[in-house]
Amino acid sequence: MKFIIKLFPEITIKSQSVRLRFIKILTGNIRNVLKHYDETLAVVRHWDNIEVRAKDEKQRLAIRDALTRIPGIHHILEVEDVPFTDMHDIFEKALVQYRDQLEGKTFCVRVKRRGKHDFSSIDVERYVGGGLNQHIESARVKLTNPDVTVHLEVEDDRLLLIKGRYEGIGGFPIGTQEDVLSLISGGFDSGVSSYMLMRRGCRVHYCFFNLGGAAHEIGVRQVAHYLWNRFGSSHRVRFVAINFEPVVGEILEKIDDGQMGVILKRMMVRAASKVAERYGVQALVTGEALGQVSSQTLTNLRLIDNVSDTLILRPLISYDKEHIINLARQIGTEDFARTMPEYCGVISKSPTVKAVKSKIEAEEEKFDFSILDKVVEEANNVDIREIAQQTEQEVVEVETVNGFGPNDVILDIRSVDEQEDKPLKVEGIDVVSLPFYKLSTKFGDLDQNRTWLLWCERGVMSRLQALYLREQGFNNVKVYRP
């Protein structure tokens, strides 16, 4: 099988040296992602496109899906590459390929041509279109808004019969821009802002401030791992967790009520800036949107920025909440965000929307900054690829099984779309479907006299959810890994 990768248009308008660098990086990213599916596949870069050739037909759908999620790709063409002799030969090959698709449909033919030939692209369109129209009685030509568009590409003596076109996410290849550190909370905003910087070519590391509760950190780990695995797995990234409970306690004890929100954000920026400096990261990323909450007015954002020289990027600054939620739905983080545990450790009764710098600084003089230094020093830094392994260690008390007993039920916790695409059927045992994002509210409704074997395709989500359910007091859960 063969795929032709078309570059994001902004890459094609770069200077020759920059364009070559971007294409080289994108080629490497594609190899890094696809080697998990087929180690023998070939990735070949050209000036206008990148070719992917693979032998394992069983991995065709998985490879195609992975390509649509790699930043820097505008669209993917799944093609059959065959030699040809003349225009009539092109027509005959197109007839074999497209006859069934065109029965009873309107169609047009669109051709792209590279190389030296004694015919033009329009000549091929007319000849092939006329031939298809004559040989398929139920089909008819319609040049505007046809039911089917027959895409052909002619390159020297090769004909590319395009079986399908699939849109990519666009943007720049990860690694073409410098690294950033995303302040991730697991909500709608931080997930979308992280994705937007990945799409723009940045390797995104994650910094999580735990304001209280292991369940929250488990949830945020899920989001970060999901984003990395889906859009950024071509690169290694860090997940840094900082226990911010001591900082919150100090703020609640010593800071004036109205200034708490702004000061908490200033402390987070200070801490994140130290982490960024430690690892050579150039900028912080937040999901703040102008006017969304009291700390996100222009005055307050300016005061928050003032505590650090590190650049703070806010890709969602002009977005409304509906737009952000729609983006979260598109990239697959909506369900995570909707079920994320909330820990509002600092809630002001009357938060200021226009903080005064002198008042903020006066309040911060009461704060013991050695507490902030200590939590940053003790921050837990892991390679995001190790989250699954670390979860295995943390859920030692949750048994992993590859078989089942008479009282067991398999609980398929994949998303609804995944369940519909690949239904799970295991002979000799009942299988119940309950998406992971409903476990926190619906698991208690299940028969607690049964033992529930949590299952997902890769085992990461099932282990994380098993840990969460055990913390909630459910001891009748195991992880199923056949």
Curated annotation (Swiss-Prot):
Annotated ATP binding sites: L183, I184, K265, G287, Q296
Transmembrane annotation, as ranges: none
Gene3D superfamilies (alphabetical): 3.30.2130.30, HUPs, Rhodanese-like domain
Superkingdom in the source lineage: Bacteria
Catalytic activity: [ThiI sulfur-carrier protein]-S-sulfanyl-L-cysteine + a uridine in tRNA + 2 reduced [2Fe-2S]-[ferredoxin] + ATP + H(+) = [ThiI sulfur-carrier protein]-L-cysteine + a 4-thiouridine in tRNA + 2 oxidized [2Fe-2S]-[ferredoxin] + AMP + diphosphate; [ThiS sulfur-carrier protein]-C-terminal Gly-Gly-AMP + S-sulfanyl-L-cysteinyl-[cysteine desulfurase] + AH2 = [ThiS sulfur-carrier protein]-C-terminal-Gly-aminoethanethioate + L-cysteinyl-[cysteine desulfurase] + A + AMP + 2 H(+)
Disulfide bridge map: C344-C456
Residues forming the catalytic site: C456
Enzyme Commission number, as recorded: 2.8.1.4
Coiled-coil segments: none
Gene Ontology molecular function: ATP binding; CCA tRNA nucleotidyltransferase activity; tRNA binding; tRNA-uracil-4 sulfurtransferase activity
Pathway: Cofactor biosynthesis; thiamine diphosphate biosynthesis
InterPro entries the record matches: Rhodanese-like_dom (IPR001763), Rhodanese-like_dom_sf (IPR036873), Rossmann-like_a/b/a_fold (IPR014729), ThiI_AANH (IPR020536), ThiI_fer (IPR054173), ThiI_N (IPR049961), THII_Thiazole_biosynth_dom (IPR026340), THUMP_dom (IPR004114)
HAMAP family for this protein: ThiI
Protein family: Belongs to the ThiI family.
UniProt name for this protein: tRNA sulfurtransferase
